[in-house]
Amino acid sequence: MNNLGRHILAEIYGCDELILNDKEYIERIMVDSALKSGAEVREVAFHKFSPQGVSGVVIISESHLTIHTWPELGYAAVDVFTCGDRVNPWDACNYMGEKLNAKNITATEVKRGIFEQPVAVKASNE
C-alpha cells in the first residue's frame, strides 16, 4: 500500500515549566529537530502567550512540525508530518522529547494519503 507521508502525533509530559515557556528555546529545538531528521527548513513562526505558553510551526519542504505548550502542566502537544521516505519524523520527535526533558512521551504514527493504487500527480497547467 502506498502513502504520501507519515504524521507523528506526540503527547509530551513531565517537561520543565521554564523550558516550555521559553519561546526562543522552543523555536531553536524545533528547527534543530527538523534539521536533525534531514528535513529542509523553509519558514518558522512562533508566538509567546500571556501569561504562559508557546505555539509554533516550522514549515519544511517535506511538510511541517508544530508545537503547543502548557508550561503549568509540563505538557507539550507536538505534530511532525513528513512526506516521502527521505526524512524520518521519529528522529525529530525523539529529539524534541529529549530537549524538553520529558519524563513521558506517548506518540502515534498515522499514515497520510493512503492509496491502494499508485497515484499520478498532474501539473496544474494541464
Curated annotation (Swiss-Prot):
It holds the Pfam family AdoMet_dc. Pathway: Amine and polyamine biosynthesis; S-adenosylmethioninamine biosynthesis; S-adenosylmethioninamine from S-adenosyl-L-methionine: step 1/1. The active site is at S63 (schiff-base intermediate with substrate), H68 (proton acceptor), C83 (proton donor). Its cofactor is pyruvate. GO terms for molecular function: adenosylmethionine decarboxylase activity. Belongs to the prokaryotic AdoMetDC family. Type 1 subfamily. Heterotetramer of two alpha and two beta chains arranged as a dimer of alpha/beta heterodimers. Catalyzes the decarboxylation of S-adenosylmethionine to S-adenosylmethioninamine (dcAdoMet), the propylamine donor required for the synthesis of the polyamines spermine and spermidine from the diamine putrescine. This is S-adenosylmethionine decarboxylase proenzyme. It comes from Clostridium tetani (strain Massachusetts / E88).
